[in-house]
């Protein structure tokens, strides 16, 4: 089985999300799947593209037998909502460049999409499910925009909340399958 994992984070980045996605990719590989990962140039948790990756729009590498396709993103750890949105949208846009550059997309049996960030997951669902007709599974690690409301970063019922809530429903409605990190998420 050929699997593409789309994630905003991946090793050598540090933290829970990169560790989970890296472990998932390596676990699937150990079970005999052919796994590719589509991700950003590494920049987390510092918010700066790592040394060895700077000055590039993309980089393909093989890590533990997994093809990793990395694309530029506007890297930031700013709390500023506008800068965070630009970061997410920059990678969401790069997904489209990948799709039309890499001809083997039609060969993927499954595409696993990490959510959040919602703009990336929404773009990936549109691209891989709607345009290329691939079976898509969404790995939910946090409920957005609910988490943002609970953290006080967003107001329920505001325009931004409504946009994120619409994207969230769109992702869930269009995925072929959904799995999460806990019972509360499912």
Which residues does each PLM region occupy?
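Structural motif
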Residues: 109-110, 177
């Amino acid at each position: 089985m050929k699997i593409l994992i789309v994630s905003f984070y991946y090793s050598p980045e540090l933290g829970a999300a990169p560790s989970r996605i890296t472990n998932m990719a390596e676990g699937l590989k150990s079970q005999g799947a052919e796994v590719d990962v589509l991700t950003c140039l590494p920049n987390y948790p510092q918010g700066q593209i790592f040394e060895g990756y700077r000055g590039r729009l993309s980089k393909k590498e093989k890590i533990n037998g997994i093809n990793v396709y990395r694309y530029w993103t506007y890297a930031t750890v700013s709390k500023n909502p506008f800068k965070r949105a630009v970061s997410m949208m920059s990678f969401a846009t790069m997904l489209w460049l990948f799709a039309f550059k890499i001809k083997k997309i039609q060969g993927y049996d499954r595409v696993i999409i990490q959510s959040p960030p919602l703009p990336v997951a929404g773009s990936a669902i549109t691209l891989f499910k709607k345009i290329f007709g691939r079976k898509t599974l969404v790995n939910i690690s946090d409920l957005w925009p609910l988490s943002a409301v609970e953290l006080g970063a967003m107001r329920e019922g505001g325009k931004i909340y409504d946009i994120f809530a619409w994207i969230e429903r769109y992702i869930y409605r269009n995925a072929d399958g959904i799995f999460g990190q806990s019972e509360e998420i499912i």
